[in-house]
């Protein structure tokens, strides 16, 4: 991304309203209120914001607050103070911290062209430190960059021992083999790209996807695991409700279309080994080898499959349960043990149930396309 692009984006953003708050009368008064931090594209412009609805079928999902951003956003993170962090889709040049509904302006962090954001950021439990996956533009090597949450200044940087690092999650289990010390699990997507061609994939025969465990205090490598099939990119992560298993959404990068379309979309990690979970034929081919967002509830695993226009569901043991139809399904989140899934014109409450509850998208979302991820706002 050039300095000219950054200056142009800043000039555009200077003329944008930082926050748009919908009046409270726009929302229904029945059922419990649900709010989700999300990102979307609408008529060529890009936004992050807060979406709001109430529990119960037919309650519209409305835009409650929004911030226009210069390019597509990807991952979001909510801090304990209620502020929302969002990063640009890889290779991204911006990260923003924003407090919806306060009237205060957003806090921007721009890359200098020597590195890029990889789409995901994670906060420490107290919200004081941020951990983002980033990539060096010259070498292609990925890192975890630790930043102060208030100033966004870098305080540490650790290698992920791979390329194309994507999502990262905490492992705070006492029985994780590392005492009571929290560790970070990071998915190295392993897909080679070049700074001059952005997201264009190249040299896929050299793919090297893995998950790594890092000491969260020092960044020391504590373990690294790979699948047998090197053309499966490990990307998005979610713990089972009991934290015994980590689910990983996969994206296939095989040269052969048939192999790519029938590839699994889910892998499971028990702390010592990785294994893929396959859907039965002919369902597997319909999934197109592309897993988007990842979530887990007491009912089981959910992997959004936007190319299949549905959500692939599995038991917690990995048995196939079914494909929940939802056009352009992508963002997933869990609230009170129930799965919320976002689609093109409506979203689903309790999407794994026999009869999910549909929430039509309100006027602010009509014609909009939700991005890959959203996060439930508590309270």
Predicted feature residues:
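Beta-propeller blade signature
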Residues: 144-148, 204-216, 263-271
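N-terminal secretory signal peptides and thylakoid transit peptides that target proteins
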Residues: 1-16
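Residue-level detector of Asp-centered blade-edge/turn motifs that repeat once per structural unit
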Residues: 79-81, 125-126, 172-174, 179-180, ...
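Short, conserved, GDST-rich strand-edge loop motifs in beta-rich repeat architectures
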Residues: 133-136, 186-207, 249-262
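Asp-box/WD-like beta-propeller blade repeats and closely related beta-sheet repeat scaffolds
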Residues: 114-120, 133-171
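Blade-loop segments of beta-propeller domains
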Residues: 68-79, 83-97, 103-123
């Amino acid at each position: 991304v050039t300095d000219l692009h950054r200056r142009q984006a800043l000039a555009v953003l200077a003329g944008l309203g930082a926050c748009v708050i919908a009046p409270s009368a726009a929302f229904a008064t029945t059922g419990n209120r649900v709010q989700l931090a999300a990102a979307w594209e609408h008529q060529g412009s890009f936004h992050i914001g807060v979406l709001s609805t109430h529990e119960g079928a037919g309650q519209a999902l409305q835009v409650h607050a929004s911030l226009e951003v210069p390019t597509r956003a990807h991952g979001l993170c909510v801090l304990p103070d209620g502020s929302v962090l969002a990063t640009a889709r890889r290779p991204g040049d911006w990260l923003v911290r924003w407090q919806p509904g306060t009237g205060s302006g957003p806090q921007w962090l721009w890359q200098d062209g020597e590195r890029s954001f990889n789409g995901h950021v994670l906060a420490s439990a107290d919200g004081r430190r941020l951990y983002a996956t980033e990539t060096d533009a010259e070498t292609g090597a990925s890192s975890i960059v630790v930043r102060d949450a208030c100033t966004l200044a870098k305080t540490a940087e650790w290698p992920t021992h791979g390329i194309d690092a994507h999502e990262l999650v905490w492992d705070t289990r006492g029985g994780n083999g590392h005492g009571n010390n929290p560790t970070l699990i990071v998915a190295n997507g392993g897909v080679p790209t070049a700074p001059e061609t952005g997201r264009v994939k190249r040299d896929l025969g050299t793919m090297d996807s893995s998950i790594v465990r890092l000491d969260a205090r020092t960044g020391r490598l504590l373990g690294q695991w790979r699948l047998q099939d090197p053309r499966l990119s490990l990307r998005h992560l979610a713990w089972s409700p009991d934290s015994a298993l980590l689910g990983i959404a996969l994206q296939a990068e095989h040269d052969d279309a048939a192999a790519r379309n029938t590839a699994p979309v889910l892998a499971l990690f028990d702390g010592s080994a990785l294994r893929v979970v396959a859907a039965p034929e002919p369902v597997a081919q319909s999934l197109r080898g592309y897993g988007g967002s990842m979530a887990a509830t007491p009912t089981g695993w959910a992997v959004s499959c936007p190319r299949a226009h549905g959500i692939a569901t599995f038991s917690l043991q990995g048995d196939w349960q079914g494909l929940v139809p939802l056009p352009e399904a992508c963002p997933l989140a869990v609230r009170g043990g129930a799965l919320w899934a976002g689609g093109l014109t409506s979203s689903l409450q309790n999407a794994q149930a026999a009869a999910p509850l549909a929430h039509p998208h309100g006027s602010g979302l009509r014609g909009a396309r939700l991005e890959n991820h959203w996060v439930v706002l508590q309270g």
